[in-house]
UniProtKB/Swiss-Prot annotation:
GO terms for molecular function: RNA binding. It comes from Chlamydia caviae (strain ATCC VR-813 / DSM 19441 / 03DC25 / GPIC) (Chlamydophila caviae). This is SsrA-binding protein. It is found in: Cytoplasm. PANTHER family: SSRA-BINDING PROTEIN (PTHR30308:SF2), TMRNA-BINDING COMPONENT OF TRANS-TRANSLATION TAGGING COMPLEX (PTHR30308). CDD domains: SmpB (cd09294). The lineage of its organism: Bacteria, Pseudomonadati, Chlamydiota, Chlamydiia, Chlamydiales. Its main location: cytoplasm. Keywords: Cytoplasm, RNA-binding.
Length: 150
């Protein structure tokens, strides 16, 4: 079971603290699949909303397929996520908590199907972002020191 990341949301990892992750299928059209295989997607402003017991991916941009003619898809349409009922209830419970939102972290191919990795996230404040940068720099210094004394 190989999986190949085709779109990632690097902005989410910088602006949000990921508390929990989940995989879901996505209902897509043929031209959307072909465009994603050419890495024509963007999850920068995307989020997941739950309404009437269904999960929807909103504001995800999939570029029009360059060889698609009049049958090409809309770039920013609502896309249904394929989840079990208990997974949707779990997400609804997490979103009900204050400050928690569901953000797509990446899209990947799994056995020919496009899957999306969702994260239950809490927004980072400016000081949290600085702490993350400081911790990353300290880790880099430690690794370089270890490399030097091998």
């Amino acid at each position: 079971m190989s999986s190949k990341e085709i779109v990632s949301n690097r902005k989410a990892l910088r602006n949000y603290e990921v508390l929990d992750t989940l995989e879901a299928g996505v209902v897509l059209t043929g031209t959307e699949i072909k465009s994603l295989r050419d890495h024509g997607g963007n999850l920068g402003d995307a989020y997941v909303a739950i309404s009437k017991g269904e999960a929807w991916l909103l504001n995800a941009s999939i570029a029009p397929y360059r060889f698609g003619n009049i049958y090409n898809h809309e770039e920013r349409r609502k896309r249904k996520l394929l989840l079990h009922r208990y997974e949707i209830r779990k997400l609804e419970g997490r979103v009900a908590q204050k400050g928690i939102t569901i953000i797509p972290l990446g899209m990947f191919l799994s056995r020919g199907y496009v899957k999306i990795r969702l994260g239950c996230c809490r927004g980072k404040k400016a000081h949290d972002k600085r702490q993350t940068i400081i911790a990353r720099e300290k880790q880099r210094e430690v690794e370089s020191a270890m490399k030097r004394y091998r």
